[in-house]
Regions:
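Short aromatic-glycine motifs in intrinsically disordered, low-complexity regions
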Residues: 694-702
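Bacterial Sec-dependent N-terminal signal peptides
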Residues: 1-25
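Hydrophobic, small-residue-rich alpha-helical packing segments that form membrane-like cores
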Residues: 471-475
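Accessory carbohydrate-recognition regions in carbohydrate-active enzymes
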Residues: 25-358, 362-405, 411-470, 481-505, ...
Length: 761
């Protein structure tokens, strides 16, 4: 008995020790940058690459398994690396711009991307947000990278070899390389891009070594050349030296979209620090931002998934500005090609990110979001339009006019502290809402129809017309909200309120679903609610019917009341995952991801329906929200390379998880409200920018105890199915009483439901 007690005590001590060790880890230690990299064009488990970067950094770095120009720059299943790429890629579908690659090698000179490629193993790979290391087996070289916002330091550990080399590949589409041996330096530029750039676009780079060059070469495409300078379609440079076994060579790299001189200035970010110091500074930067949210009382897998999602939420939009010789903020404009003062951000698609990412930044990083808003004002002044998908300039992708949501939500939640030009931004919103742009994804395609008859018709040659109508109506609501806050004329306010009800024009009373409508007022026929595309964007009617973020009560009324509405929500999950792909001529990856998820018509891998599980709160059935949100978190997310259920999309799908883990979600950006879900952890602490804290306590939380029995805020019973942003940012203590049995009486009264325009007084 004594021995048994002793053994039990020892085991308990070990458990406590391991728990302490786990809890002692810092937030960045839980991050896995490889989440989402096990992807391909036909099946996205994230479509990410390991971004070795600072939060919102101007430049990212990634190991490169894909070929030059391949949007799938790094795929987990690959077994060879072709180089280490400076990248600005937001998505494989958008591809990259301003990229160039670096690759060390030994022995016979092999500079083309296939010849220089080396086998590698994930077993000899270390991947952190602030640090990357890998062993290149074919060259017997260990390569390490640690970044700053605009620069990076490489550490190469070579074997003994007479012919150790480093290749700098400036890639094709117009590039230049110059080797300067006396300065141990390579400079150059790349113009490679995927669109959305002015004619004078260049990314200027400088690379400085700590070792003299013994050999130098340049190349043009596959042709090796003598000489130190080359300007051609596809330029590159090679420097070589003898190395001893274990010899370390350091290279410092920086770049600029402005000039060579600015690239040299950007090297200042590295200063005189050694590699390990830069690495530790990077680690500290990530811990500072990730540490703004502290989670306790979950398992290690949940910690890893949470912080990996939080990491992805802190990468985009990227900083597209630099600091001049006087420390002033300047930027190269991707809209007019000029160098101008002020902030600029890019690489985000508002169709994705207005939903959760930007509301998350408004809550946790409002100062950064104020800079982003200034950047949007600059974008409008420089290009005449707000970017709906910027990478780096205007790109013709997706639908909607969702810059309105991004601008309005930022001002409405943090307007009292804003220092940016809201007057210019409001002007930009009005301009975008009433004009078709130079691209169909800018301004509003079909705006004349929409403003005249209240919808974009199905039969006038404008694709995805129902999706456009629904998104325009919501965007008009956000303009209405902003117009009220800015005390605009009553006539103007009422105009956008009226337009925000245009969603009703597409509601089909027969099917109780949204449906494309012809110019003559008749619904399009035949109608297949399972048909993807056509009247909708990357989805079908079962997905887009819920895109009435601002007036869920109005939608419920159209369906016949709250019970009928809740039953329709139930159908999304109970229907089989059938589909009609005929619009696309084949099964696109978003369809396949819905099909394999086994959640009916719920397609969490794509954005239009991600808010839908929270809508039960508007019908007095909050427990169903709690069930389906937890199901989605548990089944659709992991911290592994296949950890997403579709494209991660620049922080949006990650921000959904982060918000949901907190226990609430911004169903309707442009209002003050977050709709309640179910917290994931037993304790979460949000440290706001001004030092105030939001404490979220759910001590009985567990896998089975996922239902909210009761909630108090600052000691007062809270029966409502929503939280106020204004109340939260004052500092708040939320105490959730969790249970394994649904509480079907809490939040059932209409006065407890979240905001709907139809209920506005």
């Amino acid at each position: 008995m004594i021995n048994q007690i002793s053994i039990k005590n020892q085991m308990l001590s070990l458990v406590l020790l391991f728990t302490w060790i786990a809890n002692a880890q810092e937030p960045v230690d839980y991050v896995n940058p490889l989440v989402g990299t096990d992807s391909k064009p036909s099946m996205s488990n994230g479509n990410t690459y390991p971004a070795i970067a600072m939060p919102w950094g101007m430049n990212f770095w990634t190991p490169q398994t894909g070929k030059m120009g391949d949007g799938w720059a790094y795929t987990y299943a690959a077994d060879k690396l072709r180089g280490f790429k400076q990248t600005h890629q937001p998505s494989p579908w958008m591809n990259d711009y301003g990229q160039f690659a670096i690759m060390p090698l030994t022995g016979k000179l092999r500079f083309t991307e296939d010849d220089r490629a080396s086998w590698f193993s994930h077993k000899s790979e270390i991947v952190k947000p602030y640090y990357y290391s890998v062993y290149l087996a074919d060259h017997d070289i260990t390569t390490e990278i640690t970044p700053t916002e605009r620069a990076a330091m490489f550490r190469f550990t070579f074997p003994e070899n007479e012919h150790s080399q480093i290749v700098l590949d400036a890639l094709d589409k117009g590039s230049y390389v110059k080797i300067i041996p006396d300065e141990r330096k390579i400079i150059g530029y790349t113009t490679k891009n995927s669109g959305g750039v002015p004619d004078n676009f260049k990314n200027y780079f400088v690379m400085v070594f700590d070792k003299d060059f013994e050999t130098t070469k340049t190349f043009s495409g596959e042709q090796l050349l003598e000489g130190l300078e080359i300007e051609t379609d596809h330029a590159g440079g090679i420097v070589g030296f003898k190395t001893k076994r274990g010899e370390v060579v350091i290279a410092k790299v920086a770049s600029s979209f402005i000039s060579y001189d600015q690239a040299e200035l950007n090297l200042r970010e590295l200063g005189n620090d050694d590699f390990n110091t830069i690495k530790e500074k990077g680690r500290a930067s990530w811990n500072k931002e990730l540490g703004r949210i502290k989670v306790e009382g979950g398992n290690v897998d949940q910690f890893r998934t949470f912080y990996s999602c939080l990491y992805r939420s802190l990468l985009f939009p990227r900083k597209f500005f630099e600091y001049d010789v006087n420390g002033k903020v300047v930027h190269y404009s991707p809209y007019n090609g000029k160098v101008l003062p002020g902030y600029m951000f890019t690489d985000t698609g508002f169709w994705d990110t207005f939903r959760a990412l930007f509301p998350f930044l408004n809550l946790m990083y409002p100062e950064l979001n104020s800079q982003i808003q200034e950047g949007l004002a600059n974008a409008y002044k420089e290009g005449g339009w707000l970017p709906e998908w910027g990478s780096p300039g205007l790109r013709n992708v997706m639908v909607g006019n969702n810059s309105a949501s991004v601008v309005a939500d930022a001002y409405l939640k943090n307007g009292e502290t804003n220092t940016y030009d809201i007057a210019t931004l409001y002007e930009a919103l009005i301009h975008g809402a009433n004009n078709a742009g130079p691209l169909t994804a800018v301004g509003r395609a079909g705006v004349d129809y929409y403003n005249k008859i209240g919808y974009v018709p199905y039969d006038v040659g404008i694709n995805e017309n129902a999706a456009r109508t629904l998104e325009y109506a919501y965007d008009d609501f956000t303009i209405y909200q902003l117009a009220k806050a800015l005390n605009k004329p009553k006539k103007e306010i009422n105009l956008y309120k009226k337009r925000s009800l245009n969603y009703k024009n597409l509601f089909d009373p027969e099917t109780k679903l949204m449906r494309g409508k012809n110019e003559n007022g008749e619904f399009m026929a035949p109608f297949n609610p399972f048909k993807w595309g056509d009247a909708f964007t990357e989805g079908n009617s079962w997905h887009y019917t819920w895109s009435v973020f601002h007036d869920i009560q109005g939608l419920a009324d159209l369906m016949g009341g709250n019970e009928a509405f809740a039953n329709k929500l139930d159908e999304v999950f109970s229907l089989p995952p059938i589909f009609d792909e005929s619009y696309y001529g084949g099964v696109i990856h978003e369809i396949r991801e819905m099909q394999v998820a086994n959640m009916g018509q719920y397609a969490h891998g794509n954005q239009p329906i991600q808010h839908m599980p929270y809508l039960y709160n508007f019908a007095g059935q909050a427990w169903k929200t709690q069930y389906w949100v937890r199901e989605t978190m548990d089944r659709m997310y992991t911290a592994e390379p296949d950890g997403y259920c579709g494209d991660e999309d620049n922080g949006q799908t990650s921000a959904w998880y982060v918000f949901s883990a907190l226990g609430f979600y911004p169903v309707c950006p442009g209002t003050d409200q977050y709709v309640l879900g179910t917290p994931l952890f037993q304790k979460t602490t949000l440290i706001l920018e001004d030092g105030k804290e939001i404490s979220i306590n759910a001590p009985k939380n567990s896998t089975s105890n996922k239902y909210v029995n009761a909630l108090t805020i600052n000691g007062k019973v809270h029966s409502k199915n929503w939280l106020s942003h204004k109340e939260l940012i004052q500092g708040a203590i939320l105490n959730f009483d969790m249970t394994g049995t649904p509480n079907k009486t809490r939040g059932t009264n209409s006065e407890d439901f979240p905001f709907s325009l139809s209920n506005e007084k």
